[in-house]
Amino acid sequence: MAAACECPEPSAPPAGSSAESEVPPAGEEEDEADDESSRSSGSGRESQGPEGGGGAGSLAVSEAEPLSRMDSEDSISSTLMDVDSTVSSGRSTPAMMNGGSANKNLSYSCCWDHCQTPFSCSPDLADHIRSIHVDGQHGGVYVCYWKGCKVYNTPSTSHSWLQRHMLTHSGDKPFKCVVGDCNASFASQGGLARHVPTHFSQQNSSKMANHSKSKEESPSKAGLNRKKKLKIKRKRALARPYDFFDAQTLDAIRHRAICFNLCAQIESLGNGHSVVFHSTVIAKRKEETGKIKLLLHWTPEDILPDVWVNESDRHQQKTKVVHLSKLPKDTALLLDPNIYRNSSKRNTHIGTLKEHLS
């Protein structure tokens, strides 16, 4: 771990001033707790003025991540999403470390190794770090050389991680809240994303409180509303115009049809009402008249009987299309027992009706 940054440009902050900290990766929860406690106590002592003590200024950013975990964009993004700060949060920025808001001529110095370039504002420092020190690294390995950083000289393969990480050193907070008169700004988009819903949750909680008060004041009105809701619920329960034959059901039926064709090894035509049979020659004979006959065998198997045809008719008899109603009933059940299931049930039902009538 490198020594703390001792930049010549920024003045020394009070000992009670809050130090900039970033939520550390997994495995450094104790550092995070220490940073949070020092930040809360420091924000309370800041109002007492510079008499609270002083010391050498240093930028200590608690972000130590091993190479195996820093290389994961998702883990780094989730870690950085916890880094949120507002204008009034008490986190130290280069402006605060150079003497607070009372000094108008603030100086922001780059604490990168072998670089002490001063700047008048934190956005300029952030642009300098991004263009010179971050984008200038090539080769697939990216390292933070900011003096005093807890991940100093720790390699990473994520270029975007290093870009987001350097925002904690520059003090730049480019993500600003646009809700109402809120002046909060954040160093990461994740912090802004978590901050914005807090405005609406406060509004919703106030609305719910007012709504509960109105119910308590007028219980009879609440009872009427409950009855109306029950009536509407009953009406909806009576008729539900939903079509359950959706795309998923159609896919399931199509899948069963494909499985049926594969198991039965058949082809169908006319919306599945006709079966296509294919013939193969299994025997050949020559009659006394000199004509040559061929014995054709039909597939699917055991549905149609083998037949002798003239050799000249072989081309026409390669395939035969037979309607399901024309198939022999004793052998058609070999295709699938469901083919005549409805008709058999219908005949059974008609027979029972006749018995009752007689």
Curated annotation (Swiss-Prot):
Keywords: Chromatin regulator, DNA-binding, Metal-binding, Nucleus, Repeat, Repressor, Transcription, Transcription regulation, Zinc, Zinc-finger. It is found in: Nucleus. This is Zinc finger protein aebp2. DNA-binding transcriptional repressor. May interact with and stimulate the activity of histone methyltransferase complexes. It comes from the Eukaryota. It comes from Xenopus laevis (African clawed frog). Coiled coil: none annotated. The lineage of its organism: Eukaryota, Metazoa, Chordata, Craniata, Vertebrata. Belongs to the AEBP2/jing C2H2-type zinc-finger family. A zinc finger (C2H2-type) spans 108-133, 147-169, 175-199. Residues 1-26, 39-49 have a biased composition (Low complexity). GO terms for cellular component: ESC/E(Z) complex. The keyword DNA-binding applies. GO terms for biological process: chromatin organization; regulation of transcription by RNA polymerase II. Residues 75-92, 199-211 have a biased composition (Polar residues). InterPro entries: AEBP2/jing_C2H2-ZnF (IPR052130), Znf_C2H2_sf (IPR036236), Znf_C2H2_type (IPR013087). The keyword Repeat applies.
